[in-house]
Amino acid sequence: MKLLIVGLGSMGKRRARLTKGIDDAIQIVGVDTAEGRRDEAKNLGLADAAYATIAEAVAAEHPDAALVCTAPLSHAAVIGELLD
């Protein structure tokens, strides 16, 4: 299974860590506009790959599911993009 986590701040990293703890075979693909957060998630082993945009991640990785871990006011826009 391939899981897309949109937002690699504290909540996104927590979800990635918990997911890996449940099943290390689940591939985590992260999305964050901040390069530092993408690098940190990969360096900590929390993301197998990380992208700057949802479109890039979906095109390259074809995830099976997604978690939205961004600021609450952005949830509707992120979910809309994921559904497209």
Which residues are covered by each model-predicted region?
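Beta-loop-alpha module in the N-terminal Rossmann-like domain of NAD(P)-dependent dehydrogenases
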Residues: 15, 40, 48-84
